[in-house]
Amino acid sequence: MIASSRLEQIEDAKEYGITLPMLLLRVPMLSEVPEVIRLTDISLNSEIKVLRALNEEAAKQGKHHKVILMADLGDLREGYWDKEEMVEMAVQVEKEMGSLILAGVGTNLGCYGSIEATPDKLQELVVIAEAIEARIGRTLEFISGGATTSLPRIFDGKMPERVNLLRVGEGILLAKDLDRFYGLDMSSMHQDVYTLKAEVIEVKSKPSHPVGTISIDAFGHRPTYVDRGIRKRALLGIGKVDYGSIDEIFPREKGVEVIGASSDHTILDIEEAAKDIEVGDILSFDIDYASLVYLTNCRNVQIVFK
């Protein structure tokens, strides 16, 4: 199964020839229901109005569309807070929406409210699933217990047995968060699968502190600067519009430091770079999950597979 929150990415995956089932990770917008049915096989849902629209559109397109109902277990993003309402909604989907297939239940933990995917939290989801199963008289296909933040429960053997689907992104794409934040040994994973490459467009020695009256930057912030004297700097032809924050990109070249950025420029301190850096050079950077999300959604960034 391939999953994305963006229908555009799902369409791209299909155009690349991927024939695996497609899951829409973000609950659908009402305005995109026709595309949800056209492009995806499964979607996460929490609103009766959207479910009815999906059912109607699936019938129009001659399809059966699977849905996973989302439970909010405290992270306070999407999902039913009232669990009795969720059970009744599941029964309604099962009995009254002939073009939808009630595939399972799911939850999100950690992405907004920073709530840990504890065994107790995940067991709450299992209890909801079993309440639904008792009402509809069959076993649900999926109990989806979160995303990368739920992987530690697999590593420590405390994942409830009935949880059989995780919507994992960072944990397989980069595998850095589990190491950094949870202390898990991820040495078996390649953590350098993605490389950001950017071209140097200027190299000059300049003061390290702006000269003049400091006001606000292009994003309305009032940064602080450290005066380190005259330093050799390089500009890159890429900026915050492309990757988000300078805190999420890491130069591979020794002695190179990212010191700032605007929308379309990134400023490096190269005074102590291990090698000479010239205009036209291509510099490589490691990236974190946030910058990966920005970069892969930016149409200005060329993505090369090797």
Regions found by a protein language model. Give the residues of each.
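Active-site anion/phosphate-binding pocket segments in diverse small-molecule metabolic enzymes
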Residues: L122-K306
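Active-site-proximal beta-alpha core segment in soluble small-molecule metabolic enzymes
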Residues: M1-E130, R135-I136
